[in-house]
């Protein structure tokens, strides 16, 4: 297939990005005294946050809801792990240099815990907390940092996990949420800075063996895939990747939400997304009231991420409980206010509508009219499976620009998720799989639905059985506590954030081990 001019321009830009990153890390000689460039380590050596012996992981996991599920999978730690807080230089969406931070987790000990080790680059999921620091494994809300240290670093992987621009020590007032270009640069720069920090003074025997694995969950699944795409385009080595439960088919996902399939974190998601794309492209709205209802329009551009807890923002009225009005924009959209199928997710969709809502009916109507005029090929019906050909709505244009149905991997990929996910719908995984089957048949892609039946000679039988048992335990606990819906609501509440991650991350670890 011939490359379009657009693809060639992207390829050239990415190559220049990587080259600039390498140049600024000392791979080229020169006497410039300019400020540190992309990928530069801003604090050398990086600060040590904590060191954890193998036995300590059992205690930490036992006090964590995700960790408790991991322990049920016969988990054991092998290596001591030293966690460093890294600070590095990256760029904002406009290409301006900006500082960011993250974690570097270094294993040590005997055997595979020392010497040349594989690198695991991890992209975390959606965070509303501006102070989020994945290097602080003891912080409330940092399940991902703990799980990455336990599943990968304590098993001999060097783990690099950026916080992203907009969090922790970052000076940017917003987060470039689901901005494929900026977020992939952030990941690449965190990786470059971490590699320059190795070997560390604390663990001098652990080095990078040249093998790179990329994974991420939820928002991080999207970021992981965008990063893989960017690195592949630049000719950088990626050994294997495992994007997990991510919104890869972003244009289809956006259409699904506006057409009544409102996911369970839609208010938070759209608040972050609007700030991201308005800052990146400048054309999402002229005034925030073009999209958002009063009284939310005035503060929405800088509301998230916040140092105020998301629950407080919801309880004090800074954010509404619903995304859309329960009154449809017109009678033509009554069947989508809310959507009723698939039936198991109908209660989630219904919760996205109410008398107090974020998005005006006028804006929802204009979005839906554009979706009808230029439909996505993957939603509501699967036609060609491609993003919309010519959207005129600015949000739909931005979603198409960041949609990942545009490339094919040359390194092995595992896609993992659960078919009843109420947060990131599983059709994202299916559309990505189908796109690659049609457009990149040489790609080596494995797809795992942890919520599916065990098949004959199923290599993931134990994970599927474990997931079913974990889901049944949530149901039972809910019923014992008085639930009258057979525990359905409890399962949906835990599905994306608690039930799926330990199983998909365990699958990713096994997948990567085969290429290590």
Q: Model regions: which residues?
A:
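Catalytic-loop region of hydrolases
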Residues: 23-115
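Short, surface-exposed "cap/lid" segments of acyl-processing enzymes
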Residues: 92-101, 105-156
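Alpha/beta-hydrolase active-site loop
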Residues: 177-200
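Primarily recognizes the serine-hydrolase "nucleophile elbow" in alpha/beta-hydrolase
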Residues: 192-265
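Short alpha-helix in the alpha/beta-hydrolase fold that links the catalytic acid
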Residues: 227, 411-412, 425-438
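Accessory cap/linker subdomain of secreted extracellular hydrolases
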Residues: 247-406
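C-terminal catalytic histidine-bearing segment of alpha/beta-hydrolase fold enzymes
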Residues: 255, 391, 395-398, 420, ...
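Short beta-strand/loop motif that positions the catalytic acidic residue
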Residues: 409, 414-421
């Amino acid at each position: 297939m011939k490359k379009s001019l657009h693809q060639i321009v992207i390829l050239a830009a990415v190559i220049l990005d990587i080259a600039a990153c390498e140049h600024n890390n000392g791979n080229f000689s020169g006497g410039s005294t300019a400020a540190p460039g992309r990928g530069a380590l801003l604090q050398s050596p990086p600060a040590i946050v904590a060191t954890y012996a193998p036995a300590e992981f059992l205690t930490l996991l036992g006090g964590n809801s995700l960790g408790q599920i991991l322990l049920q999978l016969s988990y054991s730690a092998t290596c001591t792990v030293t966690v460093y807080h890294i600070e590095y230089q990256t760029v904002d969406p406009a290409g301006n240099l900006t500082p960011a931070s993250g974690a570097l987790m270094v294993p040590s000990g005997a055997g595979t815990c020392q010497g040349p080790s594989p690198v695991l680059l991890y992209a975390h999921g959606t965070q509303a907390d501006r102070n989020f620091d994945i290097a602080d494994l003891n912080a409330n809300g940092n399940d991902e940092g703990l799980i990455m240290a336990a599943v990968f670093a304590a098993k001999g992987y060097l783990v690099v996990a950026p916080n992203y621009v907009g969090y922790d020590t970052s000076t940017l007032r917003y987060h470039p949420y689901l901005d494929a270009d900026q977020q992939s640069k952030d990941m690449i720069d965190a990786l470059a800075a971490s590699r320059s920090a190795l070997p560390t003074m604390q663990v001098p025997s652990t080095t990078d063996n040249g093998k790179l694995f990329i994974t991420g969950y939820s928002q991080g699944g999207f970021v992981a895939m965008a990063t893989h795409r960017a690195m592949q385009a630049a000719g950088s080595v990626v050994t294997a990747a495992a994007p997990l439960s991510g919104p890869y088919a972003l244009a289809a996902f956006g259409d699904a939400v506006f057409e009544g399939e409102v996911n369970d974190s839609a208010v938070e998601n759209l608040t972050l997304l609007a700030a991201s794309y308005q800052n990146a492209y400048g054309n999402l709205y002229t005034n925030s009231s073009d999209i958002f209802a009063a009284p939310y329009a005035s503060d929405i551009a800088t509301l998230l991420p916040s140092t105020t807890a998301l629950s407080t923002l919801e309880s004090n009225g800074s954010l509404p409980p619903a995304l859309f009005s329960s009154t449809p924009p017109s009678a033509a959209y009554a069947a989508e206010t809310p959507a009723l199928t698939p039936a198991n997710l109908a209660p989630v969709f219904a919760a996205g509508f109410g008398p107090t809502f974020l998005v005006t009916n006028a804006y929802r109507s204009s979005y839906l009219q554009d979706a009808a005029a230029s439909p996505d090929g993957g939603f509501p019906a699967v036609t060609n499976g491609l993003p919309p050909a010519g959207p005129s709505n600015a949000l739909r244009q931005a979603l198409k620009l960041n949609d990942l149905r545009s490339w094919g991997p040359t390194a092995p990929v595992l896609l993992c998720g659960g078919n009843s996910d109420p947060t990131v719908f599983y059709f994202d995984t299916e559309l990505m799989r189908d796109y690659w089957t049609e457009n990149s048949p040489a790609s080596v892609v494995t797809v795992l639905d942890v919520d599916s039946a065990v098949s004959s000679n199923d290599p993931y039988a134990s994970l599927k059985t474990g997931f079913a048992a974990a889901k049944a335990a949530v149901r039972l606990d809910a019923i014992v506590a008085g639930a009258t819906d057979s525990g359905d609501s409890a399962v949906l509440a835990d599905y994306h954030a608690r039930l799926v991650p330990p199983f998909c991350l365990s699958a990713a670890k096994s997948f990567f081990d085969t290429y290590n």
